[in-house]
From Swiss-Prot:
Part of the 30S ribosomal subunit. It comes from the Eukaryota. Belongs to the bacterial ribosomal protein bS18 family. This is Small ribosomal subunit protein bS18c. It comes from Phaeodactylum tricornutum (strain CCAP 1055/1).
Amino acid sequence: MVSKKQKLSPISLNQNIDYKDIDLLTLFVTEQGKILPRRATGVTVQQQRRLAKAIKRARVLSLFPFVASNSI
């Protein structure tokens, strides 16, 4: 049986996920502006829910872009 390597979460279990912390939120978003899935980031279910809410909140308040800028 092949065991899967468990990914370490980039945030601790007790760390507060805040919509104003743009540096933290950018770790969980692709270059196109999509929210990364839980299996790619290694966070828990509760952390993923809080991250998604924080990213969406930051987008609505114009702190975080909905899509990436097209800089050519």
